[in-house]
Curated annotation (Swiss-Prot):
Pfam families: zf-CCHC. It comes from Homo sapiens (Human). This is Zinc finger CCHC domain-containing protein 9. A zinc finger (CCHC-type) spans 128-145, 155-172, 184-201, 211-228. It is found in: Nucleus, Nucleolus; Nucleus. The keyword Zinc-finger applies. The keyword Zinc applies. Keywords: Metal-binding, Nucleus, Phosphoprotein, Repeat, Transcription, Zinc, Zinc-finger. One of its GO terms (cellular component) is nucleolus. Residues 1-40 are annotated as: Disordered. GO terms for molecular function: RNA binding; zinc ion binding. Its main location: nucleus.
Length: 271
């Protein structure tokens, strides 16, 4: 058996060196320009010049022409012509007398409402009485005499002395020997440790015009802060179990008020 030596095809398919873009452009235009007519040859030359131009240069943006009329598509004129207002199912033009009257009435009501609001603010401010100088029109936080006096301690927490929060938001625990409010100064006696409402020299306490708590009669707190009402609400009373009582028995705490029987009046018919 005879064997023939053959050259493998893998050695024939070797990669050639890469062609540069300039050689490719020259070769493509030279090969195609010979077979093309003159007109197409000129177009090919123009394309080659455009491609060779540097890409960094951009065309300058042309300035837009200024419009003489701002209403380009006529939309503003359309709105002016069709400006109408629907009132009670009837179409009324916005420049009619009825619409003008309604606008005037609405503005008048608005001005009156604003005037009443300012009057309420002025009345509330005049009713406020300063605890330090006893003058109306401002509170102790805005009192000029209290701000000048550094011993008053305005703008601080009366319980812990912090300037970052008020006494209503304070959660600090204080020694009872120092008093309820160690950093507070009484307006009546001028001593530290208590407020004017709990001062022994102030018989009226929290009620400057007289009176007291409606539940216990104290002058040191309001009715909403009365300890008796808070204790009575928290107390829970449990009834006793009697012999023969049902397991589903529920005690009714609120006793219904007895209703008065209505007396029927005889109806008289006159002919």
């Amino acid at each position: 058996m005879t064997r023939w030596a053959r050259v493998s095809t893998t050695y024939n398919k070797r990669p050639l060196p890469a062609t540069s873009w300039e050689d490719m452009k020259k070769g493509s235009f030279e090969g195609t320009s010979q077979n093309l007519p003159k007109r197409k040859q000129l177009e090919a030359n123009r394309l080659s010049l455009k491609n060779d131009a540097p890409q960094a240069k951009h065309k300058k943006n042309k300035k837009k022409k200024e419009y003489l009329n701002e209403d380009v598509n006529g939309f503003m004129e359309y709105l002016r012509q069709n400006s109408q207002m629907v009132h009670n199912g009837q179409i009324i033009a916005t420049d009619s007398e009825e619409v003008r009257e309604e606008i005037a009435v609405a503005l008048k009501k608005d001005s009156r409402r604003e005037g009443r609001r300012l009057k309420r603010q002025a009345a509330k401010k005049n009713a406020m009485v300063c605890f330090h100088c006893r003058k109306p029109g401002h509170g102790i936080a805005d009192c000029p005499a209290a701000l000048e006096n550094q011993d008053m301690g305005t703008g601080i927490c009366y319980r812990c002395g912090s300037t970052e929060h008020e006494i209503t938001k304070c959660k600090a625990k204080v020694d009872p020997a120092l008093g309820e409010f160690p950093f507070a100064k009484c307006f009546v006696c001028g001593e530290m440790g208590h407020l004017s409402r709990s001062c022994p020299d102030n018989p009226k306490g929290l009620y400057a015009d007289g009176g007291g708590c409606k539940l216990c009669g104290s002058v040191e707190h309001l009715k909403k802060d009365c300890p008796e009402s808070q204790n009575s609400e928290r107390m829970v009373t449990v009834g006793r179990w009697a012999k023969g009582m049902s397991a589903d028995y529920e005690e009714i705490l609120d006793v219904p008020k007895p209703q008065k029987p209505k007396t029927k009046i005889p109806k008289v018919v006159n002919f």
